[in-house]
Structure formats: structure tokens, C-alpha cells
Amino acid sequence: MITKFFASFIFIFSTFINASPISASLLNSQLKKNYSFFERSLSESEMRIDTSSGKIFFTNEEILIHVLSPFEENYRIYGDTIEIHDVFLDQTQVISIEKLDNFFLSLLIDGVDEDADAYSINVINDSIIQVIDNTRSNIISFSFLKNQLNLIRYKDSLGVEHGIELTPL
């Protein structure tokens, strides 16, 4: 009886020690991986769900996002600029990232900083981290499965809810 208790205790304790809790550093490393993505956007005002899919690639100098459906678009983020290329219309637009003032995009580019003054990082449980700006108007949830980032959820400034499922490439 005592042997079973200690064996169970040791198993539980070793599982607890070997568990790899999610953290800001894990989130940052996962945010710099290449992924295919499937996004669902829910517009409550229009009662419509839109979907898109594509691939995202990170290098030291830039982030490349290739939207493959429903419309083919390419986004190139480098320095303080985002270049948007509509493949179907063969039109390119260049925008300053500062003008966009997009919390999600800022986290994607810069990663998260536990000491940031502009937002807080909350570990909700062993699979979800939330990043909340100080105004509480921007909440981004990052969900993990076996320490792999697999879902990002947020609501944009227009009130559209986004869910982005990620699959590592």
C-alpha cells in the first residue's frame, strides 16, 4: 500500500517537474516560426463568417505573409513598412506600420516583453497566454497544444473576431 502511494507520488511529482509551462519566451520563439494558417473572421454586425488561408514566413529581416484564398495577396513587413500586393489586380500599396497602429501586428513584429509598460501578459492556464493592452481594448489570446502555438484569437478595432489556426511548416 505504501509502495503504491510513493510510486504514485513520484510519478505525479516527476510529471509536474517535467511539464514545460508556457511562458513569454516560449511564445516569442513560437511567433518566429513558419506556419500555414487558416483564419476565420466573425463580423457580428454583418452576421457573417469569412475565411482565408495561406502561409507566413519569418526571416531576420522581414515577415512574408502569402494569403492564398479567397483572394491571393502578399504582405511583406520590413523595417517600419508593410507592402501589400494584390496579386489578382497586380496592385501594390506601401504603408507605414506606425499609421496602422495595430496591436496584433506590433506583437507579431516585436514579440512580447514581460517588462513592457504598454501591456500585460497573463498565463491563463497551461495552454493559454493572453496579452492585454493597458486600455483593455486589445486582448490577444495565444493557445498552445503540447507547447506548440496552434491558435491566435483577437478582436480587431472594427469589432471583428479573428481565430487563426496555425500549422508549423
Task: For each feature predicted by the language model, list its residue ranges.
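Short beta-strand segments that buttress and anchor functional surface loops
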Residues: 37-39, 65-68, 84, 128-134, ...
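An acidic-aromatic
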Residues: 55-103
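Gly/Pro-enriched, hydrophobic low-complexity segments
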Residues: 122-169
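Boundary at the C-terminal end of the N-terminal hydrophobic targeting segment
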Residues: 17-24
